[in-house]
Every structure is written in C-alpha cells, then in structure tokens.
From Swiss-Prot:
Residues 212-274 form a coiled coil. Residues 27-45, 53-77, 117-127 have a biased composition (Acidic residues). The keyword Mitochondrion does not apply. GO terms for biological process: maturation of SSU-rRNA from tricistronic rRNA transcript (SSU-rRNA, 5.8S rRNA, LSU-rRNA). It is found in: Nucleus, Nucleolus. Keywords: Coiled coil, Nucleus, Ribonucleoprotein, Ribosome biogenesis, rRNA processing. The gene is rrp-36. Associates with 90S and pre-40S pre-ribosomal particles. This is rRNA biogenesis protein rrp-36.
Amino acid sequence: MPAVKRKAAPTLGAKLQRRVRPRFEAEPDSDVEGSSDEAPSEEEGGGFHTGSDTEEEEEDEEIEEGSEPGSDDDSDAPSEHGGAGIDASQLSFGALARAQASLGALKKKKKKKGGDEDGSDDDEEKEEPNWKTEIEKGMKAKVEKHHRTNKHAPVETTSKKPVSRRRDFLANEPAKPKSRDPRFAPPGIGGSSGKSVVDEIKARKAYSFLDDYQEDEMKQLRMAIKKTKDANEKEELQRALLSMESKKKARARKDKERELLSEHKKKEKELIKQGKTPFYLKKSEQKKQLLVEQFASMKKSQVDKAIERKRKKIAGKEKKALPLARRTAEDR
C-alpha cells in the first residue's frame, strides 16, 4: 500500500495570525437587515475569506472614520423614521460602504441640478444682449471674399446671384411713344430701310429752308471772328464755323448722290420699257461718277490741290501699314 501524506496541523502562531470576521445579531426592525444578511450569504458562498477581502474591509472602515460628520447624520436619518436606533458597530463594513456611496451619489446629483439651473440662467442673461452681434457675425461669414490669383488677373465673381422676387412688368403700364420733331430725330424710326430713305428724302425737301438760316449763321460767325480779339473765344468760333461748313459739304455730297441715283433710275426705267434688262450701279461706279462731276465743276488749280491731298492721304496709310525698319551698321 502506498504511503498517504497528511497535512501538518496548524501551529498556534498561525492560528493567532489568522483574521476572524466579527459576528453580530441583526435586529428584525432595521431597514438594513436585507443588505447585511445578503452580504454574509454571498461571502459564505465563497467558502473562505482571502487576505484581499480583509484588506478592502479595513480600507472601508478607514474611509468611514475619515468621512465628514454630515455623513453620520445622514446614516442616522433612517433611525429617526424607523423609530429604533441602529448601532453602526454591529453593521458590516460592506453595508456601510454601500450606504455611504449611495448618499454621496445623491448629493452629487443635487449639486449638478443646482449648478445646471444657475448656469442656464446665466447663459440666458448673457445671450439676450448678444443675439444681434451673433446674427451679424453669421451674415459676415456667409459673404464670400473674392480674391485674385495674381494682381494682373481679373477679379473672380460668382454667377449665382439671387433673382429678385418683385415682378413689376405686370403692374407697370407700357410707355406710350412720344411725339418727335423730325428735324432732330433719326429718319425712319420704326420702319424698314427703304422706308427710312424715303422719309429722309421727304424731310430733306420739307426742311430745305433751314439751309438759308445756316448760311446766315455762318456769315455772323465770320463777322464775329474778325471783330473778336480774345484768342480763346476766336478759336471756339472758328471751330463752330468749321463744323457747320463740314456739315454743309456732307449734305451737298449726299444730295449729289441722290440726284445721280435718281437720274440713273429714270434712264433704266425708260430702257426697261423698251424691253432691255435693267442695270444696277455699284457703289464703286457711283463714287467714280461723283468724282467726275466734282472735278468737272472745279478749276484746274483746285483739281491739282485735291489730287495732291488725296495722294498724301493714301501715302500716309501705306506708310502706317509698313513694318518698322531695322537698325543697320550704318545707323550705329
């Protein structure tokens, strides 16, 4: 038979060093009876207590002793309602710790509620006067700042412009056409191109007497230029006279063009009656015939001056069209 080893019996010193849990008799009227009974039952289910459990109980006892005096008053509160006082020395350390933790949590909740109420009142008082500034800040933040990528680049602006909600085209009546003086209005307003030419010819014939008035004004200007001694005033009068003379020449040139076209149309109408095909003058042909008639009515010296003036004008245009001359060794 194999030898069976037995455990050695614990010595007296080991027995004395072992920590023993204090026992107490729970009162039936106490409210904490359930919690005190549950604590040993749970601990007894474990079989035995380790050293860590005893250390935790000692820490709870130290916390209880170092707690504020208000906690003792709170712990005695149930005794006042229950009628019978509870001896704290008879309660377990775990039950006292749980009771103390529950009371501390209640105090914290009350403090938080009071702080939140005070804070909300202060926030409302602070926010009331500053709501305008907050709105203005929000509006400024929405405004987009347009920047240029380069100082020479154009500013980039958004195309997302809001359309106005007002629609005035239904409320406002259309403007009625105003009466115009044909002397100052352009010919053929609201008509076709052919109609405008006819209206211009009619207006020119109807208001041909204005040419006589303009001739008188030009004579008065020439007299005023001779009499005035102020250089600035004399220059202004000369400009006015020059503009009137240029307008007179332009009107005379247009009148000649119309006469030339009207004569050509009359001849073509007679030829069409004879059964011939019509021939329409080009603008280049019209200019040639106008130049021939213009030189025919001028003297030889005037013709030479006009030809020289025209030659210089054409030479100047050709010179501008030429590229710039390059520098050569002789120019250096």
